[in-house]
């Protein structure tokens, strides 16, 4: 395999790892699929069993061999980290993989990069340089690059990755985000109390600005996620017990699949939460950022899927205000006004309604509103 050159931004990484012999062996595994493709019908968990059988470990494998090295401690749960990518952000992807492999964690880490709509071979070349074991801790860490075998888009890519894992835990990381030091250790400790699902605070990066987003709690409940989207409960913070949850691939354009997953998790059992920033989330660069119409469809999908969202006045007003804003951004003034009225009826003090009306009347562009909010680490 031809290994892509590492840009200057990663020269320090390469230098720190090149002191040891390169032991990566890149192999192509051609496994036979053991079942038919998973269908899109049924609940995510019902589809999950079929999905796991339908997505064999095909793809490119980077195994970190280490003769004579001790295996990671069996007392620590193994973690499968699913990183979806479209393959056209190599520097950010390398940084994401590096940050995962650089965790000080005594258990096995298995990274599954799922390529959605691009060449797995090219993506494998992009990450080859950052996968060099440094010590015994890295001995059994592995990285695989697989094609998305399910529905195109983010939910299908995530489920492809989940199905490819045999680990105790599943974790997500977007290809433009980075785990910060101590994430895995802190979250696995939080899960040790009996929780099935854990999250943590984030550090939002927008341009040159970074702002922490904390929740001020150690537990996230269903009521919390009904009342507020809780932006800090971000997909790149998710870690949960394998076999408990799958992503719903019916989400329109993948919109709100992460909120839906967290809400379903919280309905099962409260979410363990570490209230310090352990993931750096970059806003404004995601390939999966949706268009306004997709955002509208995603919110309407959530209201239909989780009727309780319309019961809590604060939570309902927030969603209605978002729908008013998104319609205003599309120039649908009548629809924006209708949703603004519903917002005021649910909770008169909800700020999104007047903002949406300002956009609908042309007082301020929607893009400028988002830029101002993102600059402060907030979204609409």
Name what the model sees in each region.
Residues 14, 53-57, 62, 67-69, ...:
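Membrane-interface aromatic/basic loop that binds lipid-linked glycans or pyrophosphate carriers
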Residues 98-108:
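Short, acidic, metal-binding catalytic loop of nucleotide-sugar glycosyltransferases
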Residues 115-129, 150, 174:
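A conserved acidic beta->alpha catalytic loop
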Residues 137-142, 184-245, 292:
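Flexible acidic/His/Gly-enriched loops in nucleotide-sugar-dependent glycosyltransferase catalytic domains
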Residues 147-165:
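Glycine-rich, basic loop-to-helix element that forms the pyrophosphate-binding segment
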Residues 170:
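Short aromatic/hydrophobic "clamp" motif used to bind/position activated sugar donors
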Residues 217-295:
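Conserved nucleotide-sugar donor-binding catalytic segment
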Residues 277, 281-284, 289-315, 333-345:
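Catalytic core of nucleotide-sugar-dependent glycosyltransferases
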